[in-house]
Amino acid sequence: MMLGGKSSAGGRTSLRVAVAGDKGTGKSSLISAVASETFPDNVPRVLPPITLPADAFPDYIPITIVDTPSSIDNRIKLIEEFRKADVVLLTYACDQPSTLDRLSSYWLPELRRLEIKAPVIVVGCKLDLRDERSPARLEDIMSPIMKEYREIETCIECSALTLIQVPDVFYFASKAVLHPTFPLFDQEKQCLKPRLRRAVQRIFNLCDHDLDGALNDAELNDFQVNCFGAPLDPVELMGVKKVVQERQPDGVTDLGLTLPGFLFLFSLFIERGRPETAWAILRKCGYNDSLELHAELLPVPAKQSPDQSIELTNEAMDFLSGIFQLYDLDNDGALQPAELDDLFQTAPDSPWLEDPYKEAAEKTPGGSLTINGFLSEWALMTLLDPRKSLANLTYIGYGHDPASTFSVTRKRSVDRKKQRTERNVFQCFVFGPKKSGKSALLDSFLGRKFSNSYKATMGERYAANVIDQPGGSKKTLILREIPEDRVKKFLTNKESLAACDVAVVVYDSSDVYSWRKAREILMEVARRGEERGYGTPCLLVAAKDDLDPYPMSVQESDRVCMELGIDIPVSLSMKLGEPNSLFSRIVSTAENPHMSIPETESGRRSRNIRQLVNSSLLFVSVGTAVGFAGLAAYRAYSARKNA
């Protein structure tokens, strides 16, 4: 199983606690009492920060406690401390019910308004002054408040005068940060949260070496040793299984502890107030506080140049093809949403439920993901976020060395010089004016029907699919739509074209404005590529070929292409049919990275000057070499004559 995770404290080396509340609720006395272990006779209104030593609590982490002012005049200081805090203690006085009311009428809403994400501990101070005639229990009082404000981790009452539960306040504060219950357990539904269930299921699968769906005694002991450093004796093992079987009948079978039983153990840890046990297991298995694998466990190769890209190796692609077939239970060549959910059931979330992946791949009319769509999604995720790709591969059971997962492509500048490329994944930027047909092109690429209704693309959009090339080879093509209103800003980035294998500029062949804007974009792409050394092959696409072209459109576009040295526009209509030949042509263009690169007049002059300079240098070099050779021959002749 994957070990080498963080310590039980999640890798933290310090903790900062902000103590806040109404004036006179006992904030400063509480801090002074925990620091000195005595009740202070005289306490200043606001104490300076105090640090408790690392050995004060079991996790061996120093805790800095910050007192905060209650007055409105110091509001800026208070907000600053809230933002810096790892945990917030909100105090009220047990002998002043109005201060308890102020928690829900002011302090808790204020923390939400400020978007403070730190957990909250509610602390009742001056317990020694509570009116003993009041029958209300703390649980009864706080239960409705905690239901409304889920950020409250726990509530506790204490007395600085008698030192009752004073250390416990800060123990619970550290526990709320280092071993929080909130990410693990849904208090309202009284069940484990989905992310924890997914992580626990993955850990169970890693421990189930014989894949029989249960953990036998040997597997349970391996798990115990890996996480806690010591095995359980037979009596302890029997005791664990007995507790599980009493509360979760399907948690134990003749084969051992089942997944429901394993999940029940985590519920039991939390029920008994021991979330630190659950966190110790999670962190030992590499999980962070968000219940995701730590980045340090997910090494990805570094690109040395922006015109390189990262691809999955054949080994990783073979694994993905196999996992697709494993979860395609009905063998229809596509994963239904339920089958895809099952595939990612051991990942924190399904990675393709959000942009840019949500609508980026080919699906069947019923909404199932095809094998091409499945592999294309992985190629897209690897291109955009290789660490996320590796994480999700790991979640679903890929156990190979990360070094065999990815390959870093050669620089495109080198590909141009060698006039060939070894890439399997190509990225094409799709530029063009509004309403030119960019989105329709991407829809067609994914096999979607043409729609007459226009919907502007608000952000960048991706579409990925597998293209069958002549000779039987398969390449993955990723189209990236760049909205017109983002082109200018996009191209100001010096490395904007580094990742682009082919730039496609789409225009409405029936609209003169659309053509002029497309020409402007094409010239800008060409100019930027020349300036920055990222010369990009370009294709012009004359869309909406089913409409009447504007006069002189063909002649103008052909002339511009001839001047730039690129192919004449590809005419097509997404309305009349799928432009599959265009996508194959884009891939073919990408496979010949030295061709179809537009050259402006300025670029042509620069090239001529470079050639002239190089020729001059060559002439001078040759002349110099001839001169030296002649001098050497003369000296040799003179030497022989004198001899």
UniProtKB/Swiss-Prot annotation:
* PANTHER family attached to this UniProt entry: EF-HAND CALCIUM-BINDING DOMAIN-CONTAINING PROTEIN 7
Keyword Transport tagged: no
- Gene induction: By abscisic acid (ABA) and NaCl.
CDD domains the record matches: Miro1, Miro2
Q: Which InterPro entries match?
A: EF-hand-dom_pair, EF_Hand_1_Ca_BS, EF_hand_assoc_1, EF_hand_assoc_2, EF_hand_dom, Miro, Miro-EF-hand_domain, MIRO_dom
Protein topology in the membrane? Single-pass type IV membrane protein
Task: Give the source lineage, highest ranks first.
Answer: Eukaryota, Viridiplantae, Streptophyta, Embryophyta, Tracheophyta
- Using the chain's own numbering, where are the disulfide bonds? none
Q: Which GO terms describe its cellular component?
A: mitochondrial outer membrane; mitochondrion
Instruction: Pull the Cytoplasmic topological domain ranges from the record.
Output: 1-611
Locate the residues binding Ca(2+) 1: D208, D210, D212, E219
User: Which residue numbers delimit the Miro domain?
Assistant: 12-179, 423-592
Official protein name in the record = Mitochondrial Rho GTPase 2
User: Which UniProt key words apply to this protein?
Assistant: Calcium, GTP-binding, Hydrolase, Membrane, Metal-binding, Mitochondrion, Mitochondrion outer membrane, Nucleotide-binding, Repeat, Stress response, Transmembrane, Transmembrane helix
Output the Pfam families linked to this UniProt entry.
Answer: EF_assoc_1, EF_assoc_2, Ras
Question: Native species of this protein?
Answer: Arabidopsis thaliana
UniProt note on regulation of activity: Activated by calcium.
Residues crossing the lipid bilayer are 612-632
Q: Where in the cell is it found?
A: Mitochondrion outer membrane
| Binding-site list for Ca(2+) 2 | D328, D330, D332, E339
Q: In which tissues is it expressed?
A: Expressed roots, rosette and cauline leaves, stems, flowers and siliques.
Query: Which biological process annotations from GO are given for this protein?
Result: mitochondrion organization; response to abscisic acid
Tell me its family.
Belongs to the mitochondrial Rho GTPase family.
The UniProt record lists the EC number as 3.6.5.-
- Segments forming domain EF-hand: 195-230, 315-350
Q: Which residues lie on this side of the membrane: Mitochondrial intermembrane?
A: 633-643
SUPFAM superfamilies named among the record's database cross-references:
EF-hand, P-loop containing nucleoside triphosphate hydrolases
